[in-house]
Regions:
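Core segments of transmembrane alpha-helices
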Residues: 57-71, 132-141
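Mid-bilayer segments of alpha-helical transmembrane spans in multi-pass integral membrane proteins
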Residues: 90-98
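Membrane-water interface of alpha-helical transmembrane segments
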Residues: 1-7, 51-55, 72-83, 123-129, ...
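Juxtamembrane boundary at the C-terminal end of a transmembrane helix
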Residues: 144-149
Length: 149
């Protein structure tokens, strides 16, 4: 496999993952904001449960990590823009684990009548989703720059 093909495949999966994250931040999050707090408290655990079982969601977020290992072994870090993009992808995923997962857990533990706490968690989730989408988008841009040179 050529380096260009390997980078193109990594870019495709990273773009698919970034697209999913952007969809969540720009379409699904506003829909969650329209829900009353009790409905949000029921919806978010269901969303999480379905997301972790989704072959698409898990695949597009996992394939780049798995593929990075042989990429770095074979091609090292000779393409700095591409490596920077992979680093941003890793940062976006790490941000998700640090920022989003605790929110999912807290919402699952809250009762539907804890309106103020649910409202605050929803606000935090919106911010976390936007940060994650922005970093994911930057990762795709950085990786794509490599193809311009």
């Amino acid at each position: 496999m050529t380096r260009t093909l390997a980078e193109a495949l990594l870019l495709i999966f990273t773009t698919l993952s970034a697209g999913t994250v952007t969809f969540v931040a720009t379409v699904l999050q506003p829909a969650m904001n329209d829900l009353d707090e009790a409905a949000f408290a029921r919806f978010l655990p269901s969303l999480y449960r379905h997301a972790v079982r989704s072959v698409y969601a898990v695949g597009t977020s996992t394939v780049p990590f798995v593929a990075m290992i042989p990429y770095f072994i074979v091609y090292k870090v000779e393409h700095p823009w591409f490596v920077a993009g992979l680093a941003c992808f890793t940062l976006a995923s790490t941000a998700s684990k640090i920022m989003n997962l605790p929110i999912y857990r807290r919402v699952a533990e809250l009762k539907s009548d804890e309106v103020a706490k649910l409202r605050e968690e929803r606000r935090k989730l919106q911010g976390a989703n936007h940060v994650r989408a922005l970093i994911s988008f930057v990762s795709v841009l950085l990786m794509a720059v490599q193809f311009a040179y």
